Design a protein with these regions (language model features):
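Re-entrant/interfacial helical elements at transmembrane boundaries that shape
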Residues: 149-160, 173, 186-201, 335-340, ...
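Structural signature of hydrophobic alpha-helical transmembrane segments
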Residues: 24-38, 88-101, 143-151, 186-187, ...
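Membrane-embedded alpha-helical segments and adjacent helix-loop junctions characteristic
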Residues: 77-168, 313-393
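Flexible hinge motifs at transmembrane-helix junctions and intramembrane kinks/re-entrant loops
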Residues: 43-60, 257, 261, 268-289, ...
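Generic alpha-helical transmembrane segments of integral inner-membrane proteins
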Residues: 37-45, 63, 67, 97, ...
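Juxtamembrane and boundary regions of transmembrane helices in multi-pass small-molecule transporters
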Residues: 1-29, 164-170, 174, 186-187, ...
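Transmembrane alpha-helix interface/packing and boundary motifs in multi-pass membrane proteins
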Residues: 45-52, 104, 137-146, 177-189, ...
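Hydrophobic alpha-helical transmembrane segments
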Residues: 37, 56-60, 93-94, 128-136, ...
Length: 469
């Protein structure tokens, strides 16, 4: 309680300070950029040490920066609501809400228990084999379905398995989410960041796959080895499944076959439209929400109960995060990073290429990669227009800087759970099941994993681009 009060006082003091300073001194953009940076660092420190719930501090921090922006004239008071609506990515929020409802209805069928028992029997009680099964399945499916959707579908299965085994699921949730982000980076539709990049650079599904799949495939194999090393202590246990799991009748685990059939039909339709949504011009959020609405109607589900299963805290967290990053973008902090990048590389093509990879990877570990990628798109366009860069990369159909951004933003999100939508959702689901994954716990496993996988993938991607000249 004392930590909570202290944290609130600290952040409140930031707000009071900017209020007083803005009234008695002339504030310029440079001062506000510094202030915003300090507030963001304070928020990340509070999240890292879990002093206050992540949703509370992010939403409160967004409010502080929003008020400060109004006081110093960065945002006009009459445009506040328009600004907030504009910076919040409602496509992401809607996608999450729709899929959470579908997963909640699916959970009523008992299918997660059925899949869990299947996976346990297939692994024969070997936790390393079980981790491989979960990671491979998650990575492959995330190539063709948005990784947030895959996490919403698969994490409940994992939690069900390990609740039955009476073993901590945390290493497996981490491994699964890291694998999901890796797999999603391979295709145009696997990660929202790829959709943003593909739209900006006019990259089709096949071209994206041909460039990104090879480095991701090889990197995933390295990733499995790294997971074995990182979680070696947790994987030494051999589970005895000769008792309760061999005696379980799998068919009895499905509580409502009719409901399951309806869920499968709707989910298959949703996934199909996810794959073609770019071609038909319908946002993924509309598809997910439409599927959820249809499922609620045809199954006559208990709406109040289903909505209780929605992770509202995660949705509010995303909204607050989008506001925070939107303010940083409005004030020019993220654009400043782009100018610094050009200054550092001096326009040297390959130095710029690798700088984009690593700056994107490191930054995406601490700033949610969807708004970060959105901000980086105009920066990449500026870099591509640079004479030195264009003289080398201009001969290619697609600038390698787009691949660099896709690789860095996609894999960089594994560094912390804040860095990717899949990570944020995995944390939220785990917490609803009673398992708390700390920022530090994720960082210890995710950051080294991210550094090594980005390093290998960047080498392979570089060789592929050299061969394409």
């Amino acid at each position: 309680m004392e930590k909570h009060i202290l944290s609130i006082l600290i952040v409140t003091l930031f707000g009071i300070t900017i209020f007083m300073v803005s009234h008695f001194f002339e504030i310029n953009i440079s001062h506000f950029i510094l202030f915003s940076s300090i507030v963001m660092v304070a928020i990340y420190v509070i999240i890292s040490f879990e002093i206050i719930h992540r949703t509370s501090i992010v939403f409160f921090g967004a409010l502080i920066l929003l008020i400060a922006s109004l006081l110093v004239g960065i945002i006009h008071p009459k445009e506040t609501l328009h600004f907030v609506i504009d910076v919040i990515d409602f496509n992401t929020i809607g996608l999450l809400l729709g899929m959470m409802i579908i997963v909640a209805v699916l959970g009523e069928t008992g299918v997660f228990n059925w899949v869990g028992v299947k996976a346990i029997r297939l692994s024969k009680g070997n936790l390393w084999k079980l981790m491989i099964i979960l990671c491979v399945f998650t990575a492959i499916t995330s190539m063709f379905v948005d990784n947030v959707t895959i996490i919403l579908l698969m994490v409940p299965v994992t939690l069900t398995i390990f609740r039955a085994l009476k073993i901590s699921p945390i290493p497996f949730i981490l491994a699964q989410t890291l694998s999901c982000n890796l797999g999603g980076a391979a295709t145009l539709i696997g990660d929202p960041t790829n959709i943003i990049i593909g739209s900006a650079a006019n990259i089709d599904f096949t071209t994206f796959f041909l460039y990104m799949a090879p480095p991701i495939f090889v990197t995933f194999l390295l990733g499995l080895v790294l997971l074995k090393i990182i979680f070696r202590k947790e994987l030494t246990t051999v589970v005895n499944i000769s008792g309760q799991f061999k005696a379980v009748d799998e068919k009895s685990l499905i509580k409502d076959k009719s409901l399951l059939k309806s869920c499968i039909i709707v989910l298959a339709g949703v996934i199909f439209f996810f794959v073609i949504h770019g071609a038909i011009g319908i946002e993924a959020s509309i598809i997910a929400l439409g599927g959820a609405a249809i499922l609620l109607i045809i199954t006559r589900a208990h709406v109040e109960k289903i909505l209780q299963d929605v992770d509202w805290a995660t949705l509010v967290f995303f909204a607050g995060l989008f506001i925070l990053v939107g303010i940083l973008q409005e004030v020019g902090l993220i654009a400043l990073l782009g100018k610094i990048l050009i200054g550092i590389t001096g326009g040297e093509p390959w130095l710029t290429f690798h700088s984009v990879i690593w700056i994107s990877a490191i930054t995406s570990g601490f700033i949610e990669n969807i708004p970060f990628t959105t901000t980086m798109v105009p920066i990449i366009e500026i870099l591509n227009s640079n004479t030195s860069i264009n003289s080398l990369f201009g001969s290619l159909n697609i600038s390698p800087l787009w691949w660099a951004l896709a690789l860095g933003a996609g894999l960089g999100g594994n560094g912390t759970w804040i860095g990717s939508s899949a990570g944020v959702v995995a944390i939220g689901i785990s917490l609803k099941y009673g398992y708390k994954i700390s920022f530090i716990r994720w960082f210890k496993a995710g950051f080294p994993f991210m550094i090594l996988t980005v390093a290998l993938a960047s080498i392979i991607l570089t060789l592929m681009i050299l061969l394409s000249f």
